[in-house]
A protein has these predicted regions:
Chain A
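Positively charged n-region of N-terminal signal peptides that target proteins for export
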Residues: 1-5
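Surface-exposed beta-loop interaction hotspot
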Residues: 152-158, 165
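N-terminal mature ectodomain segment of secretory-pathway/periplasmic proteins
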Residues: 33, 37-124
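Gly/Pro-enriched, hydrophobic low-complexity segments
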Residues: 107-109, 117-121, 127-131, 136-153, ...
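Short amphipathic beta-strand and strand-loop transition segments with alternating hydrophobic
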Residues: 76-83, 161-167, 220-223
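Sec-dependent N-terminal signal peptides
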Residues: 8-14
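C-terminal segment of classical bacterial N-terminal signal peptides
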Residues: 15-26
Length: 273, 780
């Protein structure tokens, strides 16, 4: 009698135990599936941008404070794709406006985990300075964009987790949580909306070091180049905490103009126009 | 006319007694109904509430804050018990604190010696990095180097690091939602917990917290402290007074209920009106408690007097209401006028105080002529048949005054003139840190900061350049530099933060850290490119917008002052504007602003705005006296005892204290409404004796002393005690106001007893006519 009772208790607890394990492992499996799905989406996004070669873009940066005061800067950016997942792209930014910084050029070799290599050419002193700085999370040109928002988005910079699918405007989007893997990021996480038709980043919410929503980037006016590469011609970043806004408007983006690696060196920086 | 009013009062009193239960029920229900608005009461936590929407200093400061990064801040101040801060141990604490400060809710920027962006040139490399990176492996040479850099950096020395290297600060800039007490409290509490944790793990380190956010947060704390300690204390004092003077349980209980109901009604109405409590308006409950007593005391004293002389309770109630209806109404009216005149004040918290107190006074009047007699009618009342010594003492005082009227007139005249002459010694000073007394942690920490690190008062300038990008112009920068140097030469100036220091440092770094290049770049393009370079190299949370506006057409200069008086602050702000006007291009003209400047102007502006309010209150109150007493002559005589006490109180203050701030501006108006009460009671009795009884002025004075003398003692004692309790407030504006009002009321009684009667006997000598047509249109 007591034996029977014992065994019943035992088998009952066994059932309880295994079902508990099954439950938690199911949750784990879900989590793993979400991570896999998120990573897949990001990989697809990354894959669709492979082989763009090089671009040259003309942009206007419009800064606005919470009071509504505005300021405009103009610049060009040449970007050279560096193949492989472990290194970032190289880019050269040349400032055209305001007039007193015209001709100032900024060369950056993006790194994934280390600080970027950066050089700046100041035409007023005709000197090139290498800048050593941990400014990845710092503001780009006093705007609401940080370097890390603008520099080429390498796949390995983040871990991904799919959250849900939901409509975004007229499209259907996958919502993916991205967590920076590199040091000195200004963010604890980003929530990115990828549209499921072309895997473009339609919208990104950035969360600050306190885990509070810091800013939102909305990209629009997407145009396709070479029948493959999509680029937004309008990027609008709004800082929810300070009320400051920055809009990047591209007037022209040209692909595969034959930019060579040798054109993007410290020594050629002086000669750029 | 007078008989008609008496008859009306008598039938009113009889009605109250007849419908006593209904009256009790209705007053209680009405009170509870209004009091339920109390649930909407909340405390404001924004120091800006002291400034009206059209305050020019507030607007200047707001527009400055629109252009640059906000200035709401928390400053941690760290000081080891002994030795310098430049040790691996302390630098690590500072570094950790800098890092953790990003977790403070609403923080948008953190500045400290460790994350200061130091630029350094090595050949063609420009390193822009945290001044302190790794604390673990720092050698003595490394520590010395960091110390030397920090102390020679104008942006840090005497702002973030003390000259003797023993104290350092970690500055957190906050972006708070406007006037959100919960958000503010959250941020400040978070910082306080961090400070407590650091002190717990590092017992030999002292950590203080100051800044505009803790300042703002200290206001609701002060309001709540006043309401939770002073109001109960006032209750206690009231109970003691009532028991001592009335010697009647029912009378004491009835009075207490009247005062409580009045306060509940006022606070409930404030809740419905959506008023947010500030330290000044938090005085309202205590003030209402105090004032509500006066009405009851007058009604009860007369009633008990009648009962002692053999009248039945209900007859005594009727007689008391007949005699007191008019003076009680009149004193309430004058008090309401006095408080309502606070709406002329520059500082909105005083509007709230005035309006809440006015509602409370009106409620007290209604409740004491309706609820109180009904309550007395249903409760048992016993009085000792024997008269106490009080009255005969008052009669002796009356005889003394009548006997020595000429000497008193001269003596009192001399005292009035003599005391008033000390008004010139009053100095206006509104240092907002000193609004809080030394029991308030914010004050202690701010004093600690001032003694060890840097000043706590700042004057800010937004200085325009000629055009967009113009901050890089050599002309602009040169004048900015001259201005900064001129300011730094002033003994009151502790620190000046200017973009010229950044540009000089960059120029030096771009020239291989050669000290001879520590000067302003002499070309506009060069300066602009330096700024661009610097802007491009800043890390998370740091940007130039704290000092330069977005299109680079203006820059901010922040001047930190030592513990100077608000007069000196105003002077420095004015001299600075003048300097810019005289020495810089016209477009660079700027006025100083900031919290310190706003408070520095507040008392001055408030006095000016209250002048008209006080004058109007004075005219209205005097007119109501003339009308009520139906005598222009008595009205004119009453001007003296109504005006003199406040003037003398200022003189007494000038003699013994000297400094006063915001409080001074509202005293005359609010105390006027209160001190008039004693005059009204005395004059109305005097007038009754002259007109009803046809007595001579000396006999009428005797009658006045006999009938209201002791009631005036009691009410004055209660009022003085009530306002004296306010002087215990930790908030200086309240404490000053309480003490000044207490002094004024005490002086008023002194004047009413010793100066008013001789004046009456001097100017009101002609034989009175016993008819009711007293001089309505006097011949004089």
């Amino acid at each position: 009698m007591s034996k029977k009772l014992l065994s019943t208790v035992f088998s009952l607890s066994l059932v309880a135990f295994t079902s508990g394990t099954v439950l938690s492992s199911a949750a784990l499996a879900d989590e793993a599936a979400d991570i896999a799905k998120g990573t897949e989406i990001a990989e697809e996004w990354d894959r669709r941008d492979w082989g763009f070669g090089d671009t040259e873009s003309y942009m206007e940066m419009q800064l606005e404070n919470r009071h509504g005061d505005k300021s405009i800067r103009e610049m060009r950016q040449k970007t050279l794709e560096v193949p492989g997942h472990d290194v970032g792209d190289k880019s050269l930014t040349i400032f055209d406006k305001p007039r007193d910084v015209k001709g100032t050029a900024f060369l950056s070799f993006a790194k994934i985990f280390d600080p970027d290599d950066q050089w700046m050419y100041l035409p007023a002193v005709k000197r090139v300075k290498r800048i050593s700085s941990k400014n990845k999370s710092g503001p780009f040109l006093g705007s609401e964009f940080a370097y890390e928002d603008l520099s080429a988005q390498e796949l390995k910079k983040y871990t991904y987790k799919w959250l849900r699918d939901e409509p975004c405007g007229e499209l259907q989007c996958a919502v993916v949580e991205q967590t920076p893997t590199y040091e000195n990021s200004g963010y604890t996480k980003m929530i990115t909306w990828y549209d499921l038709s072309e895997y473009r980043q339609q919208k990104i919410d950035y969360y600050d070091r306190k885990g509070k929503l810091l800013k939102t980037l909305v990209s629009s006016d997407f145009k396709q180049h070479l029948d493959k590469y999509w680029r937004p011609y309008n990027m609008y970043m709004e800082n929810h905490q300070t009320g400051k806004k920055t809009r990047l408007v591209f007037s022209k983006i040209e692909f595969q103009k034959g930019l060579k690696d040798s054109e993007l060196t410290k020594n050629t920086l002086k000669r750029v126009r | 006319m007078s008989n008609f009013m008496d008859r009306l009062s008598v039938s009113y009193a009889k009605g109250i007694i007849r419908w006593r239960w209904l009256v009790l029920l209705v007053t209680i229900l009405a009170t509870l109904g209004v009091a339920s608005g109390g649930r909407f009461l909340s405390f404001t936590s924004d120091y800006r509430v002291f400034f009206g929407d059209d305050n020019p200093q507030l607007n200047a400061f707001e527009s400055l804050q629109d252009i640059y990064t906000k200035t709401d801040n928390i400053l941690f101040v760290l000081k080891p018990n002994n030795g310098k801060i430049f040790t691996p141990q302390w630098l690590e604490v500072v570094q950790d604190l800098t890092e953790e400060s990003w977790q403070i809710p609403y923080s948008i920027r953190v500045d400290s010696i460790t994350n200061f962006q130091h630029t350094e040139a090595v050949e063609d490399d420009l390193t822009v990095a945290d001044l302190v990176e790794e604390t673990g492996g720092l050698s003595q040479a490394g520590l010395d180097r960091i110390e030397q850099i920090a102390l020679s950096e104008p942006a840090l020395a005497k702002r973030i690091i003390s000259e003797d290297s023993t104290t350092t600060g970690v500055q957190i800039t906050l972006q708070l939602p406007p006037d959100d007490a919960i958000a503010l409290d959250e941020a400040v509490k978070f910082a306080e917990n961090m400070a407590a944790t650091i002190e717990a793990t590092n017992p030999e380190l002292e950590v203080a917290i100051t800044g505009l956010a803790p300042l703002s947060n200290a206001f609701p704390a002060a309001s709540m402290a006043d309401m939770s300690t002073l109001t109960p204390l006032m209750f206690l004092v009231i109970i003691i007074f009532l028991i001592a003077f009335l010697r009647s349980f029912t009378g004491t209980l009835g009075t207490l209920l009247v005062t409580i109901f009045s306060t509940m009604v006022a606070m409930g109405a404030a809740g419905y009106a959506g008023i947010k409590m500030t330290p000044p308006s938090a005085m309202a409950p205590t003030i209402i408690l105090t004032i509500a007593i006066a009405d009851c005391v007058h009604i009860l004293v007369t009633m008990f007097h009648e009962m002692r002389h053999g009248k039945a309770k209900r007859d005594a109630i009727v007689e008391s209401l007949r005699v007191n209806m008019q003076p009680v109404f009149l004193t309430s009216l004058t008090t309401v006028i006095g408080f309502l005149s606070l709406n002329f004040s520059e500082a909105p918290p005083f509007h709230d105080l005035g309006n809440i107190a006015a509602i409370g006074v009106i409620a007290a009047w209604i409740i004491s002529i309706a609820f109180l007699p009904a309550f007395i009618a249903v409760m048992p009342v016993r009085v000792k048949p024997v008269e106490t010594g009080k009255s005969s003492m008052m009669e002796r005082l009356g005889e003394f005054v009548i006997g020595h009227r000429t000497k008193l007139l001269l003596g009192m005249g001399l005292i009035v003139v003599g005391t008033s002459s000390f008004i010139s010694r009053i100095e206006l000073d509104d240092r907002f840190i000193e609004y809080f007394d030394t029991t308030v942690p914010f004050r202690v920490d701010s004093d600690f900061t001032r003694d060890n690190l840097t000043g706590v008062y700042q004057v800010e300038f937004s200085i325009n350049a000629e055009e967009s990008g113009g901050v890089s112009s050599p002309v602009y920068l040169a004048h900015l530099e001259d201005f900064a140097n001129w300011l730094r030469a002033k003994p009151e100036v502790v620190h000046v933060n200017s973009i010229t220091d950044i540009l000089k440092r960059l120029n030096k770094s771009m020239h291989g850290d050669d000290d001879s290049w520590y000067k302003l770049p002499d070309e506009r393009d060069l300066a602009a490119q330096y700024l661009l370079l610097y802007e491009m190299s800043l890390p998370y949370g740091l940007d130039l917008n704290s000092q330069i506006n977005i299109d680079k057409s203006a820059s901010r200069m922040t001047v930190t002052l030592d513990n100077v008086s608000s007069n000196d602050m105003r002077d420095i702000a004015l001299e600075s504007s003048q300097w810019l006007q005289d020495n810089a291009p016209g477009y660079m003209g700027a006025d100083g602003s900031g919290a310190a400047v706003m408070f520095a102007h507040l008392a001055d502006r408030n006095i000016k705005s209250m002048l008209s309010g006080t004058a109007l209150a004075f005219v209205l109150i005097s007119l109501s006296l003339v009308f009520a007493l139906r005598s222009l002559k008595l009205g004119l005589i009453s001007l003296i005892p109504n005006m003199v006490p406040a003037i003398m109180a200022f003189g007494v203050w000038g003699l013994f204290v000297g400094q006063v701030g915001l409080a001074v501006s509202v005293i005359a108006a609010t105390s006027l409404g209160l001190i008039v009460d004693a005059t009204v009671h005395f004059l109305s009795k005097y007038n009754r004796a002259r007109t009803e009884r046809g007595e001579s002025s000396a006999d009428a004075v005797r009658y006045g002393f006999r009938t209201v003398g002791s009631a005036l003692w009691i009410t004055t004692a209660v009022l003085v005690a009530g306002f004296a309790i306010l002087s215990l407030s930790t908030f200086a504006v309240n404490a000053d106001m309480g003490l000044l009002t207490a002094i004024t009321i005490a002086i008023a009684l002194f004047i009413d007893f010793l100066l008013l009667p001789p004046l009456l006997m001097l100017f009101d000598r002609e034989k009175a006519t016993a008819t009711s047509t007293a001089p309505a249109a006097p011949a004089e």
